[in-house]
Amino acid sequence: MEEKKFDPYQFIGFILIAVILTWMLYRNGPADEAAPAQVTTEQGSTTTSSPEVVQVSDSILQQQKVAAFGDLGSLFVPKQIENVRIATDNFNVEVQSKGGQIALFQLDEFENYEDAPIRLIDESNADFNITMTTLDGRIMNTREMYFSPYLTDTGDAYHLVMKASLSSGEYIAFEYHFPKKGYLHQVAIKTEGMQRLLNSGTPPQLDWKTTVFRNSISIDYENRYTEFTFGYEEDRVDYLSLSGEDQETREGIRWISYRQHFFSAILIPEAPISSATLTSVNLASDEALEEKFTKSFETVYPLTFTSGNLNTKLTFYYGPTDYKTLQNLEGDLETSIPMGWGIFGWINKFIFLPLFEFLSSFLSYGIAIIVMTLIVRLAMSPVTYKSYVSQIKMKVLRPDIEVINNKYKDDAVKRQQETMSLYSRAGANPMSGCIPALIQLPVFYALFSFFPVAFVLRDKSFLWADDLSSYDSILELGFNIPFYGDHVSLFPILASIAIFFYTQMTTGQQAMPQQPGMPNMKIIMYLMPLMMLFFFNNYASGLSLYYFVSNLLTILLMLVIKNVIIDDNKIHAKIEENKKKPKKSGGFSARLQKAMEEAEKQKKAGRK
């Protein structure tokens, strides 16, 4: 269950789908320590960088640090800087001696829009810090301490201990466990003998901060799906605002995800976090197309001393935001991916995702989208048939409706009563097209949610589209058009053309006379292709490909139904025969007519 907040982009998308629905309704109605070493294995290489000796007088530094931190001052004196680099099957990681934290985390098997390896941590864009208070009230941060590395190759993993020790034996350590396969790694935060120096009454504060790199050619599109999400017990998921700055304090958190659209950094604590301050800041703007970062995320929460020492274990996931990959891990991490809420999410998880995975296992990704579209349209063909029959009936009744509108143009209630009477005598129900339209709505919105987060489409090309997860630009404009962009994408143009012709077919087939006082729905429907063109120009080309093929197939289905399956003359004759039959009382029309009469009486009584 997700706890949703206002999302402007999903709101715009839902408005578009609502317009489509309106149109349809309208026309249908600790480890052993080893000395620093260089290790080479089949999985990769682990190296310790050459020491960088800090050319500062040790005695002067010692005096300065002791003055600042008392007995703990030696932890802040740089002797030499030793960074340890480890390569596994799935990532390269570098841990630096200053702060004992990760300075580089790189996914070599994936590339960004500049064909460079995906970096989740680099160039000081991340910080992992523990703030502690001494007995005499001094504040110290691990990011300022200097740690010595102790590396062990255990066969299936690398175990790295980064330790900052006092001469008397007390120490603070980060113990890293990097498996040689997969995207998980563990960190244990430990202290030993520090209870005589640290104030155990003031809980240490863990501060995890990341400034997210831009990885996609469209920073605006990527930023829509770059989000701070977090999970509770019982699969409940919540998130911070996508825009501006948002800071909240939450309790009982099971995991925290810094989702960078197609890549995520996820923190999984050993036990639910009692209380955490969560912050998200949007750094990108539509005009700043060359920005390096998209958002900044930060989490701060207290740790707990055990017998005066720290012994906290954390698990991190740094890898692709892929539904199947996350689903195979513990903790329901796949719920961090916005597959859609309610029935839309169920459709994606249990229908479209398995179907697309099956099709793409033996077809190219573009062809898989086309075949999936064909399957969806064939499944919806009974709905299309029902809609078309409703159109034919409304077309037959159009002249009679015009006569009623002209005859009772000054009496809305009487006009509506006569219209409903006509429907009843003709055996036509103006609401018969509503159910087919409502059935299709979950499919529309589910696919609208599915394609933008489908990791399998990333970097997959089809025809002129280099990446089905991004827009398919065929022309760079060199300037920015508001709400459109600085480029021209072809699939949205094709989809808009298909929607235009589909609109021509349906409105031409069954455009009912405009009711007085009502907006001209024909004009509104002709705006839909233009809206599609602008809205989808920066969207995933895979989604535009789906809508293009879907509308083409719908047009073909309607032509087949019209020219092969349905006999218009029989439908005409049936309606004319029904119109001649005696009027029946009761039913929906009678109840509606009675309700309208009562409303008119109350209205007149109110005027008196």
Model features per residue range: what roles?
Residues 1-49, 95, 180, 189-193, ...:
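Helix-loop-helix
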Residues 8, 33, 59, 72, ...:
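Short linear motifs in intrinsically disordered/low-complexity regions
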Residues 28-114, 120, 162, 582, ...:
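Juxtamembrane extramembrane loops of integral membrane proteins
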Residues 78, 83-335:
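Soluble non-transmembrane domains of integral membrane proteins
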